[in-house]
Amino acid sequence: KLKFEDTKTIVRIDNLQADNLIMFLKEELKEGGCAAVLLNTVRQVQETAHLLRQCFPDEQILELHSRYIYPDRKEREDELIRRMGKKSTAKERNGFILVASQAAEQSLDFDADILITELCPADFLLQRMGREHRHKEHDSMRPSNLSKPRCMILRDGEEVYSKGSKAVYAEYLLMRTQAVLPRQICIPDDIPTIVQKVYAEEDFFFQNISGYGQAKKRYEMEQGKKRGRAEGFLLQKPKTDDYEEESSLDLFLQEATKVNDKVAEASVRDGGSSLELLVLQSRSGKISFL
């Protein structure tokens, strides 16, 4: 029979000034352990990794984001799993620091002893917290000062979130997330409650936040634009009178002839445009694919 483990994790949440990041990591990792620094933009990842390399051995810093070509990214992901994955040893984890973007928060199974992160919408933030104290196999390896999970929210002076964060995530959702975050979270018990509070339509608890009304209007306008772009390419509902004569495929093909595929993709895709690049390299005077 399969065994179900009702595991609950209490995560304490604190703030950390960005200027104190290096000092904080030195203090927290002085007895060993590993840390994950998860940031909202690639630029922030690059700048932070560069800064940390000036104070920590290069082999202790792993930079990971979406701008690496596939072979390099795969190599870094493998290194992350070796150093912080389920089979990682205390020696492999000792002093290791991951500096990563959203590329690391979803599909990679790693376990950090402490998490430092920029603020992001509640569902993403909770997903990041799920990469902390993830494997019970590592509990006996954790230094005493890192024996209990902590999530440090990076702040830049009085600002709770950076301009880059507001460019990636709606400021409206960041405001609501910041307002509902408690000082500690029980995972998974508190997940539904926190997410529902952030995405609920009710505004009563948020109206006194400076700039909240304008942020909400911008969010609603953007959501309206996205719905409008998508609705223009919805398939028509089948007509009752013709339903027996025309299959769903017939109706799909009829609708498809009205829409240019590239125009449709550009209109409904939720995100910026992207280009697919083929990377070449020079070997012995010859050009070949990487």
Segments the model singles out, each with a brief description of its role:
Residues 1, 41, 99-103, 117:
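Ser/Thr-glycine-rich phosphate-binding loops at phosphate-binding pockets of nucleotides
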Residues 11, 96-97, 114:
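Short, Asp-centered acidic motifs that coordinate Mg2+ and/or phosphate
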Residues 90-105:
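Conserved two-lobed SF2 helicase motor
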Residues 14-17, 93-96, 126, 130:
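A short linear-motif detector with a strong N-terminal bias
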Residues 23-38, 43, 47-83, 87-88, ...:
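C-terminal helicase lobe and adjacent C-terminal extensions/tails of nucleic-acid helicase motors
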Residues 1-24, 28:
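Interdomain hinge/linker at the junction between the two RecA-like core domains of SF2 helicases
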Residues 2-3, 22, 54-56, 102-106:
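Short amphipathic alpha-helical segments, especially helix-boundary/capping motifs
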Residues 109:
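Flexible glycine/serine/alanine-rich "lid" or loop that lines and gates the nucleotide-sugar donor pocket
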